[in-house]
Amino acid sequence: MSVSDIEEEMREIYEIELSTSAISIITNKVNQAAQEWQNRPLDPVYLIVWMDGIVFKVRDNGKIINKTVYLCVGLKQNGLKEVLGMWVGKSESSSFWMGVLTDLKARGVQDILITCTDNLNGFTDTIRSISPQSSTQICVVHQIRNSCKYVVYKDKKEFTADMKNIYNAPNKEVAAIELDNLEKKWREKYPYAILSWRNNWDDLTVFFHFPLEIRKIIYTTNLIENLNGKIRKYTKSKLSFPSDDAVKKTVYLSLMEIEKKWTMPISNWGLIMNQFMLIFENRIQI
């Protein structure tokens, strides 16, 4: 959002007149605060880190193109959530994620116990090269959505119910049987919807190694999707942004408002933390 845009919006919406110089001072303060936030020290250990992206239209070399703001949300040892940072990129790649993870490490992160991503290109291999102890889980809800792209509308409800049997199974062995059942029922009609389950099976079923309470935290995406939805709410008036800095500034302000409500640990935290300590006793610093 340019200075003139802010000036016009303040006048039209809030009926407030601010000079160009006053707005420039305010925006410079926001830029400085955003930079300090992005570079702040982080905790040495995060129990879970979710990674996802939200797409915006941004002007780049005279053209308006899609760019993604990638967000990392960490689960701290006190049960609170924290947005670790944001990074703007045109596309995902191993080198891009190497930069993100190097940034987190430089800011103090020594270990991530579990990562949960939308099968982001290059991320799984990169996290394994930097932190081979981390468990990497592909987000199940994103997997369901991706599979449904290949399914016609009238079959989606039934197909989704059959997929639900996979991730609601009591263990990986039963889940594999449910995947076989899904394939037998639908492979003639929707082979590509099932192929992605087969190709990503090991990374889709990491959560079966953990107790039910931790599983639910891993495979649900309500957290990251709610975050993205709230960011959209704050940015819905902008059809496009003039620069990467403008996007980052707007998303930063949105995140600051959202995080004000992140004041309570996630549900059943005492039980869940005890489970983490039993499983990862040598990697958790109390």
Language-model regions, residue ranges each:
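Conserved beta-strand -> loop -> alpha-helix junction used to position metal-binding or nucleic-acid-contacting
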Residues: I114-N121, T126-K164
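DNA-recognition alpha helix
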Residues: S2-E15
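RNase H-like nuclease fold core
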Residues: I16, T20, I25-T117, N121, ...
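Metal-dependent catalytic core segments for phosphate chemistry
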Residues: E12, V69, I138
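Acidic/histidine-rich catalytic cores and adjacent linkers
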Residues: P132, N165-I286
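Amphipathic alpha-helical transducer elements in NTP-driven molecular machines
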Residues: V3, T20, S24, N66, ...
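Residues that mediate protein self-association or partner binding, especially
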Residues: M10-I13, T27, I231
